Regions:
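Active-site loop/oxyanion-hole signature of alpha/beta-hydrolase fold enzymes
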Residues: 18, 28-76, 237
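Active-site glycine-rich loops that stabilize anionic/oxyanionic intermediates
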Residues: 5-8, 75
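Short beta-strand/loop motif that positions the catalytic acidic residue
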Residues: 185, 191-193, 197
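Flexible "cap/lid" loop of the alpha/beta hydrolase fold
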Residues: 82-87, 91-128
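Conserved alpha/beta-hydrolase catalytic His-Asp/Glu region
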Residues: 106, 110-114, 124-184
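The conserved beta1-alpha1 loop
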Residues: 1-5, 193
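Catalytic active-site module of serine/aspartate enzymes centered on a nucleophile-bearing elbow/loop
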Residues: 214-243
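Conserved alpha/beta-hydrolase "acid-adjacent" motif
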Residues: 198-204
Length: 243
């Protein structure tokens, strides 16, 4: 099961998925408010925290009659998958986290990468200028400035997301703090961390690894927050070796 990150959709996995289709049953989906999802299904109360999105993951697994799922989550989906596995551990065989962050906000000795005021400023800009926010953030998130087409694709993905849902999901994503949940996760986990990532720095990947005794950390020689787009080969190889 492949789960996309904020502002994206299932199409973002297109360079990775073909390597698994012959051997595994592959499940792709869009979270409510993303991609081609049914926007009428959005419930502000249900999706006021990441647990609502985790409940959707569990519902999909149950509806399809799956078990022993390998959950591969990018960015915020890493924590969504963790919450789902904590709630229903028997459904999950293993988890792959790509660029995970349990909290984006610095707190004492914990370095999440952003000050609270930084996050508040980003959210305010998103509220006031969705297109401008997308144009500013896409190159930062994607990295790889020598390949501007990658940032352009991410910007287009941000821009086609419904602004109301984008603003809501951004708040839930960037203001969540799931550090205390990590110790509850006992599912075998692979953490794929880019050596340079402006959104989830190396220190965060190392923190997640320390908190998860059943985890393996691979620091890839890659930049940016979306290696499944910028470096799909190494991502695919790491996942295959793990599962």
């Amino acid at each position: 099961m492949f789960a996309h990150g904020y502002g994206c959709d299932q199409n973002m996995w297109r360079a990775v998925v073909p390597s698994f289709e012959d051997e595994y049953r592959v499940v792709l989906f869009d979270y409510v408010g993303s991609g081609l999802s049914d926007l009428s299904s959005f419930n502000r109360t249900r999706y006021s925290s990441l647990t609502g999105y985790a409940a959707d993951v569990i519902e999909i697994i149950e509806e399809l009659g799956l078990d022993r799922v390998t959950f591969i989550g990018h960015s915020v989906s890493s924590m969504i998958g963790a919450l789902a596995a904590i709630e229903r551990p028997k459904l999950f065989e293993q988890i792959v986290m790509i660029g995970p962050s349990p909290s984006y906000i610095n707190d004492g000795d914990y370095v999440g990468g952003f000050g609270r005021s930084d996050i508040e400023d980003l959210l305010e800009m998103l509220d006031n200028n969705h297109a401008g926010w997308s144009a500013m953030m896409a190159p930062i998130i994607m990295g790889n400035p020598d390949r501007p087409e990658l940032a352009a694709e991410l910007e287009a993905s941000f821009c086609k997301t419904d602004p109301v849902h984008a603003q809501h999901f951004a708040r839930v994503t960037f203001l969540s703090d799931n550090r205390s949940d990590l110790v509850k996760l006992h599912t075998r986990t692979l953490i794929l961390q880019c050596a340079e990532d402006a959104i989830a720095p190396l220190s965060v990947g190392q923190y997640v690894h320390r908190c998860l005794p059943e985890s393996q950390l691979i620091v890839m020689d890659a930049t940016g927050h979306c290696p499944h787009l910028s470096s799909p080969g190494p991502v695919t190889d790491a996942i295959r070796a793990f599962i």
